[in-house]
Amino acid sequence: LDFRLEPRLKELYEQHKIRAQKIDWGYHEFLPWDKGMDFKRVPWDESQVTLPSGVITAIETALLTEVNLPWFTTYLSATFKGSLSVITDFIHTWTSEEDQHSNLLETYLLLTRSVNPKRLHELRKSVVEGGFEPDFHTPIEAMTYTTLQELAT
């Protein structure tokens, strides 16, 4: 990236951090903990699902997108290696935020018994095992993809 962008990128990153401080991404206050039941004691059954299938699909899709985080973070780090330090800082912050989103979505689905926990585990495992093979190769393509993925989820 052009070093002349660094002051503006630092400014944008600082603005992001200020906005992020006002949002508590700690999911402990958002989840219906009182609905939680031990799956060994009370096995999952399809009759326990209360969310519409479209909502479940949307949450699962967002979750599975976030699950690719280890691969995508590695890709971003390699793509921007040796770039501006603010980019590296942002990648680390973004990774932390995306991990929180993933944890929130998965925990919500399990607490509300909206999905078969074994099926969700297998889906998650399959996505991570599948890796991430981008078909783009430049920093601008990586930023474009990341922006679209962020807006979609």
Give residue spans per PLM region:
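Non-heme di-metal
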Residues: L1-T153
